[in-house]
């Protein structure tokens, strides 16, 4: 019987299934960070339980760490407590951790794949909604709650119910200047933030297969923003080439054995999906979100939508509220929207490919950040990404143009550290969420690709990067 990739991954990890469909699922890898793990570790201590499989866990601090000078530690007492608590818990339980001073430290969804800790065929969980990122490797990956983090630490299993299968098929060739970020924003714009609810979402088609692993991670990262439980891409040579030789990846004979299995991790010909969504890559344009939800997105060629043209009263009210919060008027050209700050980073777009794309735009335009842009910052996803970018001279390109070159961390993706928007400030951001207050109380977020963000920083407003050549 032909199986989908999701079916294969699920079936390979079922320990037991109850009559109501509740399944005990084996977990191969748990990633931990400082925000959702303290209560889980405390629960283990109170119950006097050990970590069941220490080697299956990998930890890093990312949400609360400063991205400026770290020589004086963390100034904010709450952030410091969370980071110190993770350090102490990992030391106590013997869990491998990349501490703040380790060059391997970075955003959890960047360092996992970077280290080869995320592998095809795995079940991967983390107390973070964007764990779907790891599905790019032909893995079943999704976020879990704090009580579930404790459950996995104690048992290496998770209670779950199976999702339905969805295929998002993107065929054709992307126009020059368009990226994986534009693909996934276009998908969310098409199906909405509830379009994937109840589904595990597989991304396929020639445009997806043409993406690098960095691009595939960007797409899977935002599957959760379409409402899906997980996002995934089948394994191919691009997957294997990325993994080979990484620290946690198998070596020698074990590598050959693993590859033999990994090559089966794709949906079979004729596999049945409960729902299929199709897009043509050549129809995708550089995307810019205008509202307070990732589904509120249009292309750089468009104008801010007019609520009066929306027949659904619920959607119309949501649009009106979003426009009020974003301080935008209907029918304004997207290219006329001026910005105050630029953030290039996050678990969506902080890998070396993203750094290169942004630096290329900066070089192409050959100017400094616009006078109306108060701050433009580039935050690499890990210390290793930062090192690689510096070897290539990308940091010099950014700094010469007036960008700040920062230390790795979640940074301005969310207002949980020193990097945030002030009320009323408008930001071109390569992150994944544009909710009210996401980047700071009263802050206004526009989601874009790294290239679009870099161009906006230099021009002071959104521009069409396709016109750069």
UniProtKB/Swiss-Prot annotation:
Its EC number is 4.2.1.33. The keyword Coiled coil does not apply. PROSITE patterns: ACONITASE_1, ACONITASE_2. The keyword Amino-acid biosynthesis applies. Pathway: Amino-acid biosynthesis; L-leucine biosynthesis; L-leucine from 3-methyl-2-oxobutanoate: step 2/4. One of its GO terms (molecular function) is 3-isopropylmalate dehydratase activity. Binds 1 [4Fe-4S] cluster per subunit. GO terms for biological process: L-leucine biosynthetic process. It catalyses: (2R,3S)-3-isopropylmalate = (2S)-2-isopropylmalate. Keywords: 4Fe-4S, Amino-acid biosynthesis, Branched-chain amino acid biosynthesis, Iron, Iron-sulfur, Leucine biosynthesis, Lyase, Metal-binding. Pfam families: Aconitase. InterPro entries: 3-IsopropMal_deHydase_lsu, Acnase/IPM_dHydase_lsu_aba_1/3, Acoase/IPM_deHydtase_lsu_aba, Aconitase_4Fe-4S_BS, Aconitase_4Fe-4S_dom, IPM_dehydratase_rel_enz, IPMI_cat. Its cofactor is [4Fe-4S] cluster. Belongs to the aconitase/IPM isomerase family. LeuC type 1 subfamily. PANTHER family: 3-ISOPROPYLMALATE DEHYDRATASE, HOMOACONITASE, MITOCHONDRIAL-RELATED. Heterodimer of LeuC and LeuD. Catalyzes the isomerization between 2-isopropylmalate and 3-isopropylmalate, via the formation of 2-isopropylmaleate. This is 3-isopropylmalate dehydratase large subunit.
């Amino acid at each position: 019987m032909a199986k989908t990739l999701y079916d294969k991954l699920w079936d390979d990890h079922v320990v037991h299934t109850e009559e109501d469909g509740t399944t005990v699922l084996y977990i191969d890898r748990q990633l931990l960070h400082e925000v959702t793990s303290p209560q889980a570790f405390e629960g283990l201590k109170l119950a006097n339980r050990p970590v069941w499989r220490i080697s299956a866990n990998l930890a890093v601090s990312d949400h609360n760490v400063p991205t400026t000078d770290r020589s004086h530690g963390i100034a904010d007492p709450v952030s410091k407590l969370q980071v110190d608590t993770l350090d102490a818990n990992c030391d106590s339980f013997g869990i491998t951790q990349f501490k703040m001073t380790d060059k391997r430290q970075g955003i959890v969804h960047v360092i996992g794949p970077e280290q080869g800790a995320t592998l095809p065929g795995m079940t991967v969980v983390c107390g973070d909604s964007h764990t779907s990122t790891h599905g790019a490797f032909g893995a079943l990956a999704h976020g879990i709650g704090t009580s579930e983090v404790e459950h996995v630490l104690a048992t290496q299993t998770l209670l779950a119910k199976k999702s339905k299968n969805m295929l998002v098929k993107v065929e054709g060739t992307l126009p020059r200047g368009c990226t994986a970020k534009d693909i996934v924003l276009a998908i969310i714009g098409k199906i909405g933030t509830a379009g994937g609810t109840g589904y595990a979402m597989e991304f396929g088609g020639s445009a997806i297969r043409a993406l690098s692993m960095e691009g595939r991670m960007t797409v899977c990262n935002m599957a959760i923003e379409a409402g899906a439980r997980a996002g995934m891409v089948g394994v191919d040579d691009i997957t294997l080439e990325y993994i080979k030789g990484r620290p946690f990846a198998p070596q020698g004979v074990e590598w050959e054995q693993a590859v033999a299995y990994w090559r089966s991790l794709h949906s079979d010909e004729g596999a049945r999906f409960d729902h299929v969504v199709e897009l043509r890559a050549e129809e995708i344009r550089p995307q810019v979100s205008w509202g307070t939800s990732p589904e509120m997105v249009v292309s750089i060629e468009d104008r801010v939508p007019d609520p009066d043209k929306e027949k659904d009263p619920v959607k119309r009210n949501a649009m009106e509220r979003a426009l009020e919060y974003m301080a935008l008027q209907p029918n304004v050209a997207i290219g006329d929207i001026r910005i105050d700050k630029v953030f290039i980073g996050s678990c969506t777009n902080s890998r070396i490919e993203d750094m290169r794309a942004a630096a290329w735009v900066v070089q192409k335009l050959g100017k400094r950040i616009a006078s109306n842009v108060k701050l433009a910052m580039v935050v690499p996803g890990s210390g290793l990404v930062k090192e690689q970018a510096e070897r290539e001279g990308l940091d010099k390109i950014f700094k010469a143009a007036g960008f700040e070159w920062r230390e790795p961390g979640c940074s301005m993706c969310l207002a949980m550290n020193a990097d945030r928007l002030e009320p009323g400030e408008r930001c071109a951001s390569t992150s994944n969420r544009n909710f009210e207050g996401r980047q700071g109380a009263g802050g206004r977020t526009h989601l874009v690709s790294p290239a679009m963000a870099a161009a906006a920083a230099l021009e002071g407003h959104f521009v069409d990067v396709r016109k750069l050549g």
